[in-house]
UniProtKB/Swiss-Prot annotation:
This is NF-kappa-B inhibitor-interacting Ras-like protein. In contrast to other members of the Ras family, the members of the KappaB-Ras subfamily do not contain the conserved Gly and Gln residues in positions 13 and 65, which are replaced by Lys and Val residues, respectively, and are therefore similar to the constitutively active forms of oncogenic forms of Ras. This suggests that members of this family are clearly different from other small GTPases proteins. Belongs to the small GTPase superfamily. Ras family. KappaB-Ras subfamily. The gene is kbrl-1. InterPro entries: KBRS (IPR042227), P-loop_NTPase (IPR027417), Small_GTP-bd (IPR005225), Small_GTPase (IPR001806). Residues 1-199 are annotated as: Small GTPase-like. It comes from Caenorhabditis elegans. The keyword Nucleotide-binding applies. Signal peptide: none annotated.
């Protein structure tokens, strides 16, 4: 038996959410097939490492959010999510604006409960001429404290890093130290420095 996490994948219409998930979970390139709007779907990805329990990512594919009007996700997605993956097309600036609004909406929902939910952003269609500048997007991601990956649904290898990042962040979180050595604690005369440990 393995451990599972639920990842909700959201973004505007026609940004390639389903194409990304089909490539990751089914090893199928659907980028050349006619566009079919997604209502919702679920995919599973198994992460396996020797001598470790199986880890399963349950990826929830959602209908594309409208390019106009207020942002809102189904309550069931918000309640179930262990992480969010926000997708925009680097060839469509409006889809980037919607991701910015989605990020702020998610922050407001989880800010009420003081709960931190990881958010990863995918800049899809990196193989097309970009209208969203890469440096601008990375600057935005740093300011919003999210991890940004530039990917293309045509290339499965470009998608591997974000899957491993999401899984590792959930199943193997690193403990951030709450203490730091200040200058007052460091003795210049002592040849045997003390070590502070975070428990």
């Amino acid at each position: 038996m393995g451990r599972a996490m639920r990842v909700v994948v959201v973004g505007g219409k026609k940004v390639g959410k389903t194409a990304i998930l089909r490539q990751v979970a089914c090893v199928e390139d659907v980028t050349n097939k006619p566009y079919e709007p997604t209502i919702e779907d679920t995919y599973q990805v198994l992460l396996e490492e020797p001598d470790k329990a199986r880890e399963i990512l349950i990826l929830h594919d959602t209908a594309g959010v409208s390019n106009y009007g207020p942002i809102e996700l189904k309550k069931a997605y918000v309640q179930a999510a262990d992480a969010f993956v926000l997708v925009y097309s680097s060839a469509d600036y409006e889809s980037f604006n919607r991701v910015d609004l989605l990020k702020k909406w998610i922050d407001r929902q989880f800010g009420k409960d003081k709960k931190e939910v990881p958010i990863v952003v995918l800049a899809n269609m990196r193989d097309r001429p970009a209208t969203v500048d890469s440096a601008f997007a990375h600057s935005w991601a740093a300011r919003e404290k999210v991890k940004l990956f530039e990917v293309t649904a045509k290339d499965r290898q470009s998608l591997v890093d974000f899957i491993h990042y999401v899984g590792h962040r959930h199943f193997h979180p690193t403990k951030e130290s709450k203490f730091s050595l200040s200058k007052k604690l460091k003795s210049e005369k002592s040849s045997n420095p003390a070590i502070l440990m975070d428990f």
